[in-house]
């Protein structure tokens, strides 16, 4: 009964994965008065030339910057001639301002002054949303070519290229639709009966496949027949897929490959194939297995190989002499000198390898062999390096263990090493548990001391957790706990791919990723796999415009017209202000990060940016009189900084006593005071002298 339940669970998860891959992704966000919309009855929509969204309602005009709604309407004493705030329509005029119909009157909303103006001969029509008719749905095509339709009754459908129209989600995904607008970024806005909807269509990057039972992927491997093997921990299975990505079957304990869900006898942590075609499996905690004699690729003979220093096998590598090097967690590195023999001989570190550092390298995670026959081992206590030799001389091999050193800056950044990889130039990269990636700079890998270049948070990388690292074209790809980081070793530039990129929460496993026969990369997850084509590992090219959404001076709210200003002049009694801004990326507003800088010399060559995370305001206090330049920039939806710097010049007016004439006057007053004091002293002394002379003459 339990087996039937597992099979059913797996089948459902596979069906779910297929469905998720076939159905395009869209995010639907609903807004109403609870979110700040000034009134639920929206009569029209428009997007201005900068990208800001505007909505006409029966309670004035409403602006949305991606974070908050703000209303604009007539106020008593503001000089506006609006008799009512019942907006019937809004449209974008050719001059960049907004036209508004208020009942039967026409007004211009001046975006430079943020005021309603009654002018003659104004443009009576412009760009705004399209009405949805009962017999004419609104059509929108997303970035990958899917055709979306919004129907009058609220139905939302999609039609892939060459496919058929299919309902999205429930039969009625939205409230009854009245108007629709496709913005400059490709988002779809729907004005419904009592709310508005924003529908965004994120780029689908790869495919996340959950295995349904929370099993961690421990090993992925491609054999010589272009089949790929996936071993998972909790359910103790080994799945085999053909080059067409079809499931061949499960590896059974007796060596057969069976179609139904079948457990292997223990969790498999590593898989490799030797030159003679044998498949070797490393497990925890049952040691080493050899698979030979494949019959039509459907059955193997399985031999258990004993004699290891530990039965926790994490990696297996074959050197050019045909020997196997086994990484064990607890028994160090072991060598199988004759792997083809019926009973292979195992050389263990604590008896056969006489120079092995027993105290430092007991727990080995991974082994890397270079073309120059240098073995580099990732251990929990450092990087173990040795030069391979031929024949029985392995017993006299010399090992060097490199660890983190407190007083050497170019030492290994973290002793807990995860894996080792080479790039296309043969440079060696070492991933660590919490110290990022290290590149070996020393030419001689077997030197007593190695020098490392660090790629970590201290040097600009987004994370220090590097579960593994692999060569990726002319760059390196680091696998973090929840992200992938592609970086250029020469200049340190990087691209970070996280939750926003995957459109899902991904927790990566320690399994080293592999390139599949179809060109995609396969990454192990804590509960499944992530598949992605190399060309999909790229960043969004959209550069959001930054709008200045408001300013507060000395705690008093100022005009929204700051968005149209190049220069803001503060009075002599105004020394502190808060500037609010928003990058107009409606597909990822809450995921954007910001930074600002304050320049007092106008030099933008070497700007020191203040990163403020997701906060979209900057407060500057107690400014001295003078002219400043405030710079604001943001990331895009993928977290990459883009070239969208917004500049605002701030002129702080000095008080009279801070001006040059006041300083001159003060100097003159001081000189006059000192001059008067000196004159008085001299006068008094002269009088005293005259009195003394008169007294002497009298006597």
Positions of PLM-derived features:
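Cytoplasmic C-terminal tails of single-pass
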Residues: 688-699
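Carboxylate-rich, polar loop motifs that coordinate divalent cations or form catalytic acidic clusters
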Residues: 1-683
